[in-house]
């Protein structure tokens, strides 16, 4: 949409699109003429507590997408639950001294409570231990059996003589036969991701007792995946050929790799008691294996709430779009295994249309581990008293869509305090408080001008992007788009200065009323965009606006709050996170509490000497007594020494932790003070401007100092000018003589040859177009706008690190004064700046409102970029040695942050302490 004022006014004054209705799940059925969206989140094992990685990987991502679908008015049914059958449950029940049913009841309630606290809004959250599960699972199997897609054969299995049972694959560990990973499970290797048979493991061990199992034979049923490969391939090819398919890139890659290797018959039964019984003679003591049984849980859980109407969702492929949300380790089961079962049953099942898989979310620089005390689990997140919506926001901001990411407390604080508190929360409170304080809480009359049309048009463009991102399941990008909208709102208010206009004549006050009315409506529109991400905050904003109903999404920020509308009571949406409290959380969840492992062991008592026969030699008795006493004292001294050493170690650990926490607290307070000072400066300028005090810009001295003119303080001083002598000084006859001439014969300014970051020409750029290099599989060729008359061609080796779709229309930082170089026949005229480790490369990020061509500077080093860096002088190589990502994620050179323009910083998404190059 352009900035035509008449069109903008028409759109702004359009009628409301309707409201989102809260429906009884029993009434949610597919409807003709509507998009009917069926959403599933991978069913978690019921024997554990979900951590943040589990939550973002499936249930939260699916919840956000379901909420978006409801905002768009689609018929949406969202299914979730707990996977309760299998060896994992049996084993956990043994460990906890209860029955499998009791264990399932306990953990189902735990999962349900955690998801409710996180605001996960399932249409129904069920479980797999139901009669409906048995009925549908057995029915699908019997149809597969009848259609000739099953077989039986004796197989080698691992049997633990010590536990007296066949071992399920997940309860055998050993060395992977394919990649030699030494902690592979018996069903799948976490090292290479390939499925394996437990009997093929090297150095296999029973997970329960650590004994070495032996191989025994048992007769099992196999699903003939080889016979079903053609059907499944045809279905997958049709889905992936659709231009609007929403398969994540990792799901596509994993699926294609599986199909390319070819499918083999796979065992679907196990020697267990806790599971869905096999309805065939001779197999009464066996149950279905979890990979066959668990996905059927989606169907049975749907039947638990809809009854016989479950088939309207699950046997209706012509009218239903199925979206599966899974972690990358679940792709094969949802893309290959389960579709094979459905297609082989030949019962018109709704088969996967869109598979949305995430990579892994790690914790800081390690993995989530309940046993090691590392990472945040769902129940612990509640205990922090940080609201659930804050967790939702950060998890979605860091959603691992194309590569593994990591939860970082430092980044968590940064994003919450900067993006939520200072950006989004500041704008909402600012706009609504102005209505409350200057207009008595009543929305003023609005008469739009071209300035208003411009911001509304920009927000309309962002909202179109938001809709496209959500529809394509690019949830992380959608979060950043919302922040862009609130940033535009802040910039609009700042540029229009309604607080100044309020002090002018009647026309000025009317103009201020228009600005504040538009800002208040933008704030309400932000609440709609925010609903899928932060539903509670969205509701709070709508209540403060005095219009709590949730409208359907419209891409244009229409006038929800008409002139004369009475708003509610504005109040701050977010509280600043306290660095001291965060330091406590870092210690608590960092696995530093090793009290059990460091506790002193109980000292063994010295063995008593056997009583000697009585003797008359009293001297001998005394000698023996003194010897025994010496032994006891010596052993006691050793125990005391051990206790002292252990306590000293614990003291040193506590001291180090205390010191680290104090430093982090002081660092956090210092950063917050810097933000507070800037905020107060900004408020002072506003007040002085409102009072009519003229603002005089701070003078800037442009000079190029010599190395000696920059003192240690970093403040650049200009040396007093001297008249040039008529003849060169004796000490430097050549320098004066050889000084280069500028244009017109004038002497050029002295050149500072000091090698530092100021000689780099780094700028913000926007990738206009990116495509694969025609002659190199590992290279991209980008056209990047760096603020010049034409875009630059840049070749980057990012194919293995960043998907092609994420390279389009992306803001980057570009080094522009390297010598152009040909890379496989294409000349590259710049370099995209990335955080780089041996295993991972991330493009450095800049604020979404950054403009192409904006220079990247590093005060106090003078920005004086060479026209082209001389390769012989190794300027780039020298500077690059100290160009790194800080512990907080900022790019810095020798400890000084690199700034976009003069304020914002360039950041790495997850990498810390690595080089930028």
From Swiss-Prot:
Motif ('KMSKS' region) on chain: 367-371
Enzyme Commission number: 6.1.1.10
GO CC term (a single one): aminoacyl-tRNA synthetase multienzyme complex
Location of the protein in the cell: Cytoplasm
Residue ranges, compositional bias (Basic and acidic residues): 614-623, 732-741
Residue ranges occupied by any tRNA-binding domain in the UniProt entry: 756-857
Catalysed reactions, as listed in the record: tRNA(Met) + L-methionine + ATP = L-methionyl-tRNA(Met) + AMP + diphosphate
Compositionally biased region (Low complexity): 702-713
UniProt cross-references to Gene3D superfamilies, sorted A to Z: HUPs, Isoleucyl-tRNA Synthetase, Domain 1, Methionyl-tRNA synthetase, Zn-domain, Nucleic acid-binding proteins
GO molecular function list: ATP binding; methionine-tRNA ligase activity; tRNA binding
Major site of localization recorded for this protein: cytoplasm
InterPro entries: aa-tRNA-synth_I_CS, Anticodon_Met, Met-tRNA_ligase_1, Met-tRNA_synth, Methionyl/Leucyl_tRNA_Synth, MetRS_core, MetRS_Zn, NA-bd_OB-fold
Signal peptide positions on this chain: none
GO terms under biological process: methionyl-tRNA aminoacylation
Enzyme class: ligase
CDD domains assigned to the protein according to its UniProt record, in alphabetical order: Anticodon_Ia_Met, MetRS_core, tRNA_bind_EMAP-II_like
Region annotation (Disordered) ranges: 591-623, 702-749
Record keywords: Aminoacyl-tRNA synthetase, ATP-binding, Cytoplasm, Ligase, Nucleotide-binding, Protein biosynthesis, RNA-binding, tRNA-binding
Repressor recorded as keyword: no
The protein's name in its UniProt record: Methionine--tRNA ligase, cytoplasmic
Organism annotation: Caenorhabditis elegans
């Amino acid at each position: 949409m352009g900035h035509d004022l008449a069109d903008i006014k028409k759109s702004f004054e359009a009628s409301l699109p309707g409201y989102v209705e809260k429906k009884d799940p029993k009434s949610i059925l597919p409807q003709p003429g509507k998009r009917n969206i069926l959403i599933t989140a991978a069913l978690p094992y019921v024997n554990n507590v979900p951590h943040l990685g589990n939550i973002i990987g499936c249930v939260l991502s699916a919840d956000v997408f379901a909420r978006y679908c409801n905002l768009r008015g689609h018929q949406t049914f969202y299914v979730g639950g707990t996977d309760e059958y299998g060896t994992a449950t049996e084993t956990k029940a043994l460990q906890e001294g209860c029955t499998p049913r009791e264990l399932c009841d306990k953990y189902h309630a735990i999962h349900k409570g955690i998801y409710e606290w996180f605001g996960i809004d399932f249409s129904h959250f069920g479980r797999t231990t139901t009669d409906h599960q048995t009925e549908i699972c057995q029915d699908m199997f019997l149809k597969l059996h009848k259609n000739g897609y099953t077989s039986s054969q004796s197989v080698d299995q691992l049997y633990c003589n010590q536990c007296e049972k066949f071992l399920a694959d997940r309860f055998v560990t050993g060395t992977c036969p394919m990649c030699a990973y030494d902690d592979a499970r018996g069903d799948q290797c976490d090292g290479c991701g390939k499925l394996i048979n437990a009997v093929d493991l090297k150095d296999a061990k029973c997970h329960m007792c650590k004994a070495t199992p032996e191989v025994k034979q048992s007769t099992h049923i196999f699903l003939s995946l080889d016979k079903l490969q053609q059907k499944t391939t045809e279905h997958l090819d049709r889905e992936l050929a659709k231009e609007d398919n929403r398969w994540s890139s990792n799901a596509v890659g994993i699926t294609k790799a599986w199909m390319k290797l070819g499918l083999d018959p796979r065992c679907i039964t196990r020697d267990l008691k806790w599971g869905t019984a096999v309805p065939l003679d001779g197999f009464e003591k066996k149950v279905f294996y979890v990979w066959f049984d668990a996905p059927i849980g989606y169907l049975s859980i749907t039947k638990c709430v809809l009854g016989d109407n479950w088939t309207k969702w699950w046997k209706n492929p012509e009218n239903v779009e199925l979206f599966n949300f899974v972690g990358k380790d679940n792709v094969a089961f949802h893309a290959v295994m389960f579709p094979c079962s459905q297609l082989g049953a030949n019962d018109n099942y709704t088969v996967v249309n869109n598979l949305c898989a995430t990579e892994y979310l790690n914790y800081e620089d390690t993995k989530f581990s309940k046993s090691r005390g590392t990472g945040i689990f769902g129940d612990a997140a509640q205990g922090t008293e940080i609201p659930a919506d804050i967790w939702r926001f950060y998890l979605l901001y860091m959603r691992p869509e194309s590569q593994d990411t990591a939860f970082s407390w430092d980044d968590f604080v940064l994003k919450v305090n900067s993006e939520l508190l200072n950006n989004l929360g500041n704008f909402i409170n600012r706009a609504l408080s102005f209505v409350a304080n200057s207009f008595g809480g009543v929305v003023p009359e609005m008469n739009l001008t071209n300035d208003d049309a411009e911001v509304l048009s920009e927000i309309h463009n962002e909202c179109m992007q938001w809709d496209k991102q959500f529809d394509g399941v690019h949830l992380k990008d959608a979060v950043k788009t919302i922040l862009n909208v609130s940033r535009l709102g802040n910039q609009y208010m700042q540029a229009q200065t309604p607080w100044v206009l309020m002090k002018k004549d009647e026309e000025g006050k009317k103009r201020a009323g228009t600005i504040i009315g538009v800002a208040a409506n933008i704030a309400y529109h932000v609440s709609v965009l925010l609903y899928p991400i932060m539903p509670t905050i969205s509701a709070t904003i709508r209540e403060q606006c005095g219009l709590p109903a949730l409208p359907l999404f419209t891409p244009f920020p229409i006038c929800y709050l008409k002139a004369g509308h009475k708003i509610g009571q504005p109040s701050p949406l977010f509280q600043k996170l306290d660095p001291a409290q965060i330091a406590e959380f870092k210690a608590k969840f960092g696995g530093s509490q090793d009290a059990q492992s460091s506790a002193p062991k109980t000292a063994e008592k010295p063995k008593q000497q056997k009583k000697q026969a009585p003797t008359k030699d009293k001297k001998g008795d005394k000698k023996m007594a003194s010897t025994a006493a010496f032994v006891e004292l010596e052993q006691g001294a050793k125990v005391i020494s051990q206790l002292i050493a252990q306590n000293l170690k614990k003291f040193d650990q506590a001291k180090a932790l205390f010191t680290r926490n104090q430093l982090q607290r002081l660092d956090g307070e210092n950063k917050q003070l810097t933000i507070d000072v800037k905020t107060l400066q900004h408020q002072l300028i506003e007040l002085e401007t409102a009072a009519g005090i003229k603002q005089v810009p701070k003078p800037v001295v442009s000079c190029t100092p010599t190395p000696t003119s920059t003192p240690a303080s970093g403040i650049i001083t200009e040396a007093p000018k001297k008249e040039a002598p008529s003849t060169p000084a004796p000490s430097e006859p050549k320098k004066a003589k050889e000084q280069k001439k500028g244009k017109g014969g004038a002497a050029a300014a002295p050149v500072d040859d000091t090698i530092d970051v100021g000689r780099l020409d780094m700028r913000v750029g926007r990738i206009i177009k990116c495509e694969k290099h025609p002659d190199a599989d590992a290279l991209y060729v980008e056209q990047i706008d760096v603020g010049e008359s034409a875009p630059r061609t840049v070749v980057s080796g990012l194919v293995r690190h960043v998907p092609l779709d994420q390279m389009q229309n992306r803001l980057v930082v570009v080094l522009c004064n390297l010598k152009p170089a040909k890379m496989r026949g294409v000349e590259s005229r710049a370099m995209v700046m990335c955080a780089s480790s041996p295993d991972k490369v991330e493009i450095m990020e800049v604020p979404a409102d950054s403009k192409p061509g904006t220079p990247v500077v590093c005060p106090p080093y003078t920005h004086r970029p060479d026209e082209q860096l001389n390769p012989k002088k190794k300027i780039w190589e020298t500077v690059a040695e100290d160009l790194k990502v800080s512990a907080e994620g900022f790019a810095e050179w020798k400890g000084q942050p690199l700034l976009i323009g003069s304020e914002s910083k360039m950041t790495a998404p997850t990498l810390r302490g690595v080089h930028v190059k």
